[in-house]
From Swiss-Prot:
Plays a specific role in mating-type regulation of yeast, by acting post-translationally to control the stability or activity of the SIR4 proteins. This is Protein SAN1. It comes from Saccharomyces cerevisiae (strain ATCC 204508 / S288c). The lineage of its organism: Eukaryota, Fungi, Dikarya, Ascomycota, Saccharomycotina. Present with 172 molecules/cell in log phase SD medium. The gene is SAN1. One of its GO terms (biological process) is nuclear protein quality control by the ubiquitin-proteasome system. Disulfide bonds: none annotated. PROSITE patterns: ZF_RING_2.
Length: 610
């Protein structure tokens, strides 16, 4: 998901003479036109796209393209001119699938940048919660609709059904008559209510008697004691549990389609699905309208709560004052980030864009605990990478950052570099990533590529997607001989190896989703074959030697002869003799002659020749 925020100034002086005041954060906070407060209109567009293996592969190809440097420079100039950012995820990406647009009018121009970042974070959280509700909508039926289904007796079951439930294969049992159970519960409630009434009457009479008799305070103290309310609380809790999680017996129940299941089993199924487990016919036709109305009500309530938070962020003066007190410390780390200005702009419209990944939690849990901005300067440098196309929230140093409201921290696309950094210092300027070359600290590309924070980010992502971390070890760590050979081959070979390692993330995504399994295996086989050819076949033979360290191998030829050899870390012993070189098969070890005693016909001639 990508965020694109649009700010339009109203009432500000946009003449070219005041262009030098763009970097002054207090330029728009002063009064204008006789003390009137400056305001602006803010429009935030939350653009979203659906990630598929094909699109992830397309994004990986774009990130590895050498033309990203020119594209990022052109995009940076476009944003500076106020014509808007490029749509899609990353430069040259596809058009977004949709957008959630929020517009707010008459926002005070003196609103600090931290408040605007919080506003964008709340808008992004609103969009993510809406996606959660769309993806995790309940599909089951209510308890009232389930109770309308007819319950059968075991004796009334057709002979074709049998006495077993087709879901759990347990025997059916007759359900207790609901009318009798209801009468029993009503009688118990009446008896309990009568007992409570008698207890209250008995407690009230001594109380009136002892009120006139002041000479015996001990009796008064004994009659003032109130009855315990534990039974009523437990009874109410039991009723609530029975309504939410009712207990049914394994009585046969008939669905509208005619299939019969156990009542307990089909109730658990109906809480999740409104269809028959066998034929997928709907169980209840009126559930869709009721569920849609309930979902609309919940969505309206959630939107109102989010809009109230945004209103407090933008228009509440007390919140603005508290934010100004918390953010009184000056910002120090502004060299690695491009912070959009709040003051007078050279044009009447200013655009800011941020691009990042957001992870949707499982089981539809709400996103109430966003990620906090790291307080350390080193962590901020690791998150806010040097990039001219992605603009992240400003990082204010100091201890006051811990008191600020939590916010989303988008991960820039430029940090998703799964290839190993180029160790050659002479080629660092040309082989470095475009995002690092475009940053203000482009002279330290080699040190940024080997930054431990990048390695830590790579390790976290590898742990999430169960990808073996390759190419991120320190210089002191020991590596395989084959990896050292590829590491020292030069610039041409390093580009191909980087592409192979960069695709591991996409291949694992495809493996998790069940797509392109055969294609990824074929690619891996081709890559291994090409690497073996470049290394003189040493790697393939080493893998064969390490495949089986010891054991016995048997081979049967076309004539029916069986040859058995022992595997003793010898590659030649693992392969059976061929018909073209019969002398090699006859010159096997002594163990072959002892095993071939039971082989008829042709093998006898071989033993005689030996």
């Amino acid at each position: 998901m990508s965020e694109s925020g649009q700010e339009q100034n109203r009432g500000t002086n946009t003449s070219p003479n005041n262009a030098e005041n763009n970097n002054n954060s207090n330029a728009a906070s002063g009064p204008l036109n006789g003390g009137a407060e400056q305001t602006r209109n803010i429009t935030v567009s939350i653009q979203y796209s659906y990630f598929t293996p094909e699109r992830l592969a397309h994004l990986s190809n774009i990130s590895n393209n050498d033309n990203n440097e020119n594209n990022s420079a052109a995009s940076g100039s476009t944003i500076a001119n106020g014509t808007g950012p490029s749509f899609g995820i990353g430069n040259g990406g596809h058009q977004p699938d949709g957008a959630l647009v929020l517009s707010f009018r008459d926002v005070p121009a003196s609103t600090p940048q931290d408040r605007l970042n919080s506003f964008i974070s709340v808008a992004a959280q609103l969009a993510m919660e809406r996606f959660n509700r769309l993806l995790n909508r309940p599909k089951g039926i209510s308890k009232d609709e389930f109770d309308k289904l007819p319950v059968l007796q075991v004796s009334d079951l057709p002979k074709a059904e049998g006495p077993l439930c087709s879901i759990c294969y347990d025997e059916y049992e007759d359900e207790v008559d609901s009318t009798k159970a209801k009468r029993k519960r009503d009688s118990e409630n009446e008896e309990e209510s009568e007992g409570t009434k008698k207890r209250k009457d008995n407690e009230g009479a001594p109380l009136r008697t002892t009120a006139d008799n002041d000479s015996n305070p001990s009796i008064t103290n004994a009659t003032v004691v109130e009855p315990p309310s534990i039974p009523l609380t437990e009874q109410q809790r039991t009723l609530n549990d029975e309504e939410t999680n009712p207990s049914y017996k394994h009585s046969p129940i008939k669905l509208p389609c005619g299939h019969i299941f156990g009542r307990e089993c089909i109730y658990k199924w109906s809480r999740l699905e409104n269809s028959c487990p066998l034929c997928r016919q709907k169980i209840s036709e009126s559930v869709g309208v009721q569920r849609a109305a309930q979902q609309d009500t919940d969505e309206v309530a959630a939107n109102e709560a989010a809009f109230e938070r945004i209103r407090r962020v933008l228009y509440d003066p007390t919140a603005v004052n508290s934010t100004n007190e918390n953010s009184s410390a000056p910002s120090e780390n502004t060299s690695n980030t491009t912070v959009p200005t709040i003051g007078n702009a050279s044009s009447g419209e200013q655009m800011l864009s941020r691009t990042g990944f957001f992870l949707v939690p499982q089981n539809g849990q709400p996103l109430h605990n966003p990620v906090r901005l790291p307080p350390n300067d080193s962590d901020r440098n690791g998150v806010n990478g040097p990039s001219s196309t992605t603009q992240n929230p400003p990082s204010n140093s100091g201890g006051s950052n811990n008191n600020q409201s939590p916010r989303w921290v988008p991960i820039p696309l430029t940090l998703f570099q799964f290839h190993s950094p180029n160790p050659n210092p002479s080629a660092s300027d040309s082989s470095a990533s475009p995002s690092a070359a475009n940053g203000p600290n482009s002279n330290n590309t080699s040190s940024d590529a080997t930054d431990p924070h990048h390695n830590r980010l790579r390790a976290v992502l590898d742990h999430i997607f169960n990808v073996a971390q390759r190419g991120t070890s320190d210089t002191s760590a020991t590596t395989a001989p084959g990896a050292q050979t590829v590491h020292n081959q030069g610039r041409n070979d390093s580009s191909s190896s980087d592409t192979t390692q960069g695709s591991s993330f996409l291949e694992n995504i495809s493996r998790l989703t069940g797509h392109f399994t055969n294609g990824s295996r074929d690619n891996n086989n081709d890559n291994n074959h090409s690497n073996d050819q470049q290394r003189g076949g040493s790697t393939g033979e080493n893998n064969r030697n390490n495949l089986f360290s010891s054991g016995v191998a048997s081979y049967r030829n076309q004539n029916g002869d069986v040859t058995t050899v022992e595997l003793r870390n010898n590659n030649s012993a693992a392969f059976p003799p061929t018909d073209e070189n019969p002398s090699q098969g006859q010159g096997s070890s002594s163990s072959d002659t002892t095993i071939h005693n039971d082989v008829p016909n042709d093998n006898n001639e071989q033993r005689s020749s030996q």
